[in-house]
Regions:
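Conserved PLP-anchoring active-site segment centered on the Schiff-base-forming lysine
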Residues: 115-134
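Conserved glycine-rich beta-strand-loop-beta hairpin in the small C-terminal domain of fold type I
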Residues: 308-316, 323, 329-348
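Active-site phosphate-binding strand-loop segment of PLP-dependent enzymes
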Residues: 148-224
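Hydrophobic residues in well-ordered beta-strands that form the structural core
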Residues: 122, 143, 208-210, 372-374
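Conserved core segment of the aminotransferase class I/II
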Residues: 4, 235-309
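PLP-dependent enzyme catalytic core of the Aspartate aminotransferase-like
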Residues: 2, 93, 350, 363-372, ...
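Helix C-cap/helix->beta junction micro-motif
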Residues: 37, 137, 203-204, 325
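N-terminal small-domain helix-loop-helix segment of the aminotransferase-like
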Residues: 5-103, 147, 296-297, 395-398, ...
């Protein structure tokens, strides 16, 4: 099901140099506070992978715990070689000298925006931190809608028009960020869109930053990820990390693949200069474990396969509940996100005083303990009745439950996940009922 046309919607970008706390982190902190107060919650705002670390990763980290010296700014040779192999196996031949490691791909993305300079074009909707990081560099973001039924990549034709118009106005747009697969929609842009994006980037001399942190969580392995590095290798930076497919978000370890050639070497030198002044080097013990992880031994490859299946099963089960409530729900292709649109229910919501995405997210959180994020957090106008829903914290209250979910052929039927799904349906039925029923207390769990 295609997304509605958003080409006339105004961009929502923070003022240059200023930003508040990340919307995802703020929502997660609110949910944790409610949980501590004894309030039942459905935590679907924070994009954490929600699974225990594989024992092999804990072993590798423990064995490297004594590594307390600073290392190379670009990362250890073993890590850079392992990351190069990871990309080469995915059809992107990579030399270790093109790899830069950092304390998470988020830090690398900020470093790249900082040294590239100028404004950055971003998809609308797109991950909350792209525009915020652009603001922190003192520049700004140019929001460009995604094509219908796709996510993560600005519509190439609209991108060309938007950049040319911005430049005529004196704005200095130098780069474009894409997310393959996408956060917030869980969708994956097709090969024709990515290929045309590369053509536009070459015509307009834009650098491409391709955030591929969810690449290994595509639900159907036959649904291939097309990286812009395959079509515009001379101007594409690719980033990834351990946070999503291996659920190691707290380890803060990411890697970037810089373009080959003179431009790439200059960009790499600039990035290393910034890195040397900001983070010095990625944590040495984590680099050792990351080198093991990017080597993709069979035990970790199997773990990622099972994780992918769990994410797919629960994300689609949650999508079914939103669809049953009357929402438009583009089916997710990857990861643990979906992006339901309550537009068809706008009249019923207005009867409850809900007229914007932030209104809707606030109602779900404050009254029902259901955490989501409004589309406005991802660059949409406030009036968009769309929510980003993350399903990965529904897998269990402890590691025993989460591991059982990981091993289950039908995790959505496990009692604790089924209860969460039923609670979600109950809340959605109450919120979207033809007649308002909000005067008293919400229905109990």
């Amino acid at each position: 099901m295609p997304f509605p046309d958003r080409s006339d919607s105004p961009p929502a970008e923070p003022p240059a140099g200023r930003t508040g706390i990340s919307a995802t982190l703020a929502a997660n902190e609110t949910l944790e506070r409610k949980r501590r107060e004894g309030v039942p919650v459905l935590p679907m705002a924070f994009g954490e992978a929600g699974l225990p670390l594989h024992p092999a990763l804990r072993r590798e980290l423990a064995e490297a715990a004594g590594r307390n010296a600073y290392g190379p700014v670009a990362g250890s040779p073993e890590l850079r070689a392992a990351a190069a192999g990871y990309w080469t196996r995915r059809g992107l031949p990579t030399e270790p000298g093109l790899v830069v490691a950092g304390p998470g791909s988020k830090a690398l993305l900020f470093g790249l925006l900082l040294v590239i300079g100028g404004e950055v074009a971003v998809p609308r909707p797109s991950w909350v931190s792209y525009a915020a990081q652009a603001a922190l560099t003192g520049a700004g973001a140019l929001f460009v809608p995604t094509p219908p039924d796709e996510g993560g990549v600005p519509d190439p034709g609209l991108l060309a028009n938007a950049v040319q118009r911005a430049r005529r106005q004196g704005r200095d747009v130098r780069s474009v960020v894409v997310t393959l697969p996408d956060n917030p929609t869980g969708r994956l842009a097709g090969e024709p869109t990515v290929r045309r994006l590369c053509e536009v980037a070459r015509e307009l001399d834009l650098l491409i930053i391709s955030d591929e942190i969810y690449r290994d969580l595509v639900h159907d392995p036959a649904h291939a990820v097309t990286s812009p590095a395959a079509y515009a290798p001379e101007r594409t930076v690719v980033t990834t990390a351990l946070s999503k497919h291996l659920a190691a978000g707290g380890w803060r370890l990411g890697v970037a693949r810089l373009p080959d050639g003179p431009r790439g070497r200059t960009l790499r030198a600039d990035l290393l200069g910034a890195a040397s002044e900001i983070w010095s080097c990625a944590p040495a013990p984590v680099q050792r474990a990351a080198a093991y992880a990017f080597g993709e031994p069979p035990e970790l490859a199997e773990h990622v396969t099972r994780s992918r299946g769990l994410h797919a099963a629960v994300a689609h089960a949650v999508a079914d509940r939103f669809a049953a409530a009357g929402c438009r729900v583009p089916r997710p292709h990857a990861s643990f996100y979906l992006y339901p649109d309550f537009g068809p229910l706008a009249g019923r919501l207005a009867a409850r005083g809900v007229r914007t995405g932030p209104d809707l997210a606030a109602l779900l959180l404050d009254r029902y303990g259901v955490g989501t994020l409004p589309g406005s957090a991802f660059g949409e106008p406030d009036g968009a009745l769309r929510l980003r829903v993350a399903t990965s914290l529904l897998y269990g209250e402890d590691d025993e439950q989460r591991l059982e979910a990981l091993a289950s052929p039908a995790p959505q039927t496990l009692p604790w996940i089924a209860r969460s799904l039923d609670r979600l349906s109950q809340v959605l039925a109450e919120v979207t009922a033809p007649e308002p029923a909000l005067a008293g207390s919400p229905a109990p769990w």
